[in-house]
Amino acid sequence: MRLMVEAHHIELFKSLFKGREDVFALRWEKNGKSGYMPAYFYDPYRFRQHKMNGGTFQNFADKKYKALSDQEIGRHLKGEQLVGLYPLLINNTSWFVVADFDKNDWLEQCVKFLKACEEYFIPAYLERSRSGNGGHVWIFFEEAYPAYKSRRIIIALLEKCGVFSVFDKSSSFDRLFP
């Protein structure tokens, strides 16, 4: 079965998941490890020559960041590739903030955080992580907002609902993006 991704699906994605447009990340897996790295344009023939001379992709100079295009988003929505955004814009603002939760009690702590957001009329959305052993709580902004301010607000909410404390090392709260 082939998935159809229409223009309005791509526009919906772009209306929510806004980040840097000049670069995006692609997920990789190799030898049991995985992660994300920037997507690049490069000449594979020149890279192969560079590699034969002892070079690595990291020190290969003839590469440029690949911009996040509608085509790349379409491939992501079809499941052909996994795209990651760089949410922190050049001016240190972002269109969203995400709280990452892991460990055994992640769901309980996510629910506490969601209730705190609701108490302050902050729309927040829970997503289960790829592993299934954690969650991400997404908060979207109507306009790009200074990242340091959004982080302060979210940390204060996490502390208020008892999910995070600088002294508590057992919290399932892991980090914020950006």
Each predicted region: which residue ranges?
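Short linear functional motifs in flexible/disordered or boundary regions
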Residues: 25, 136, 149, 162, ...
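Short, glycine/charge-rich beta-strand/loop segments that flank catalytic centers
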Residues: 129-134, 171-175
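Signature for HUH/AEP ssDNA processing cores
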Residues: 2-133, 140-156
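Flexible helix-coil linker/hinge segments at domain or subdomain boundaries
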Residues: 158-178
